[in-house]
From Swiss-Prot:
May function as a substrate receptor for CUL4-DDB1 E3 ubiquitin-protein ligase complex. It holds the Pfam family WD40. Belongs to the WD repeat DCAF10 family. WD repeats lie at residues 65-104, 108-146, 150-189, 195-234, 306-346, 368-406, 424-457. The gene is dcaf10. This is DDB1- and CUL4-associated factor 10. It comes from the Eukaryota.
């Protein structure tokens, strides 16, 4: 924790208590420490230590290379299947344990396949530049379960709320669309437009589905708090919780239409009435955030304070503690990977609340493969980050010991530590993914090769 305080030491005034005391036990329990909270924690710690011995193991090559670049990788929740989204309309399926090819969905879509999302161990969804989403069943891959129509431009990513069984998609048309998979038929699923913003790049849900994060090519990050997917958000129907130009300096909170940036991704509506609505609701609820309240941020990016940037990739910590961004400068001459901690709790002053995100760690990336989005990811326990780096990948940690984020939060933003660099491709790596169950990483590159990495002793 901050200041390098040991868990067992008594800290005056912070209520931590001494080792073995009830306050010490409660503090560690709140942080998720101890077998009574997370029985898998020690297992994940052991698995993380194995990544220091990881090497390229196999390449899942095919006899023909017609699928083009690899844009996305996704494991099934039980780790038994690895799916690959490809440039040339195809989806590939592999057994990640044996590295054997299972099947090729040769005409999964009519254009590039951008993203794959498993709904459970057998059902998965794919989205494409052909503006559609397709649902598939691993038990019957000869045909799609159904095709979903609703977007008007390239569909770029898919999220899924396991509690409500609602599918959430976003695309370059600026729309976030909700699909009710509970009432899915061969003709599709009932759907509705949930949100719209300009310059949309990526959309993600936090693990508990309490927040939606949206990144934009104009450098803005939108956060919908107290998320309710059952309500569509039309212009003026949601309160603006916070709107800030920066995430680390002065409280430049927009309180009227005069202070809104001209390139703001919000709707073309005056922010003044929306802020007044929010403030009145906030006073009634004693500072609690209203449902679907919107926060607009410009995340701090090292080296980019005086220039615009594009947030090309967006991921969430598996425990919901932080968000992971890959940013590139508007001139495409720099790329950064940044980690931002969620700062929860009611603000001290509602008229000038603190920002929800704080930059904790960052690292500069190799500036190769310009114009292509590089998809990075967290490990299943959130201790490590796998990030595409030129013709390989880098494993990054919050410190050299791969501690959890909550155990090594710095007072000021620090550099991510390179745990291991792995180079096994002959072209620019575009995507990487950790297996949810095995000590394995997969990566895919621009020329279509998929490589698996496993420990070797």
């Amino acid at each position: 924790m901050e200041g390098g305080t040991n868990d067992g030491a008594a800290v005056p005034g912070n209520g931590a208590g001494t080792a073995g005391s009830i306050f010490w036990w409660l503090k560690n329990r709140c942080l998720g420490r101890g077998l009574c909270v997370d029985p898998a924690r020690d297992n994940f710690r052991t698995m993380t230590s194995l990544y220091s011995s990881i090497h390229p193991a196999d390449s899942v090559n095919l006899s023909t290379r017609t699928h083009g670049a690899v844009f996305n990788l996704e494991y099934s929740p039980d780790g038994s299947v690895l799916t690959v989204a490809c440039e040339q309309t195809e989806v590939l399926l592999f057994d990640p344990v044996s590295s054997k090819h299972i099947k090729t969905l040769s005409e999964a879509h009519e254009d590039c396949v951008n993203n794959i999302r498993f709904l459970d161990n057998r059902m998965f969804a794919t989205c494409s530049d052909d503006t559609t989403i397709a649902l598939w069943d691993l038990r019957k891959l000869n045909s799609k379960v159904c095709t979903l129509h609703g977007h008007t431009s390239w569909v770029k990513n898919i999220e899924y709320d396991t509690n409500t069984r609602l599918l959430v998609t976003s695309g370059f048309d600026g729309n976030v669309i909700i699909w009710d998979t509970n009432r899915c038929t061969e003709d599709g699923c009932p759907h509705k437009k949930f949100f719209h913003t300009r310059f949309l790049m990526r959309m993600r849900l936090t693990p508990d589905c309490s927040k939606m994060l949206i990144s934009t090519s104009s450098g803005y990050l939108l956060i919908l708090h107290e998320l309710d997917l059952t309500k569509s958000l039309e212009v003026g129907s949601y309160p603006i919780l916070r709107a800030r130009r920066t995430a680390s300096t002065s409280d430049m909170t927009s309180t009227s239409s005069d202070t809104r940036p001209s390139s703001s991704p919000c709707h073309n509506s005056d922010l003044g009435p929306l802020f007044e609505k929010h403030m009145s609701r906030s006073s009634q609820r004693e500072g609690a955030s209203p449902r679907n309240s919107l926060e607009v941020l410009t995340p701090e990016v090292p080296g980019e304070r005086d220039r615009g940037n594009c947030i090309t990739s967006l991921q969430l910590h598996p425990k919901g503690w932080a968000t992971l961004l890959r940013c590139s400068s508007n001139t495409d001459d720099q790329e950064w990977t940044c980690v931002y901690e969620f700062q929860e709790g009611a603000p001290v002053r509602q008229v000038s609340p603190r920002c929800s995100l704080r930059l904790t760690h960052y690292i500069e990336e190799a500036n190769v493969g310009r114009g292509y989005i590089k998809e990075l990811c967290f490990s299943p326990d959130g201790r490590m980050i796998a990030s595409p780096y030129a013709y390989g990948i880098r494993l990054l940690g919050f410190d050299s010991q791969c501690k959890e984020l909550v155990d090594c939060l710095p007072k000021e933003a620090g550099t991510l530590q390179v745990i291991r660099s792995l180079y096994s491709h002959k072209d620019v790596v575009l995507t990487t993914k950790f297996s949810p169950t095995h000590c394995q990483i997969a990566s895919g590159c621009l020329s279509g090769r998929v490589t698996l990495y496993q420990p070797k002793f």
